[in-house]
Amino acid sequence: MKKIIFALFIIVLVFQPVSGFSQSFAKIYNSPTDFFNGICDSSQGISVERRTRGQIIMNGGNDFKISSEDKVLSKKLKKQVWGVVCNDSLFINGRPLKLGGSWYGYTEIIGKRLFLLAGIPLDKDFQDQMAIASMMGGPLVAGIAGADLALVRYYYEVYLPYGSISILKKEKMAELLATAPDLAQSYALEEEPEKIPVLKRYLLELKKR
């Protein structure tokens, strides 16, 4: 009975209405170096779709699916493209960076710095650095831990022009806020300084400066 209820719950999640859908002109970047140098391809009819919680639990991956009516371009967008700018928003593909699996994460641009919101790293050395194994509690239990991990998000700083990455920790955030003493003082008082909503709030405040 419990298995049936769980299965029905998953079906409901997967078939939630999709939000955040758009279809428009986009700039397509094949590498971080191309983005840094302003070299891009352009295309009409690019779709940006916010994936549902159920889709992420069932299939993993990041928060945004980007595709095209052109099947060849859609395949390239999924597996090869580094980033897409659509409606002045930058989305970076997690697949080439081995972050969160497939699909794209929304990226804040602050000056010349990029902050990507994406899933857990798939690179084992990176996982070890972030102590992700401890979050799993050993082997995954009946897929539940795996589902929880599929929803975990981190902010990563993506360094241009070559695209190396590092996780945004409280020490790095404090360093970023050094140019805004009022924000730095407020951030120092946060009880959970590495929670995503907290980091996002300060990134957005810094972006306004």
Enumerate the language-model features and the residues they cover.
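Aromatic-patch recognition
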Residues: S24-L183
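Generic hydrophobic/packing signal
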Residues: S22-K27, R201, E205
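C-terminal partner/receptor-binding element of secreted or periplasmic proteins
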Residues: A174-R209
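Bacterial Sec-dependent N-terminal signal peptides
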Residues: M1-A26
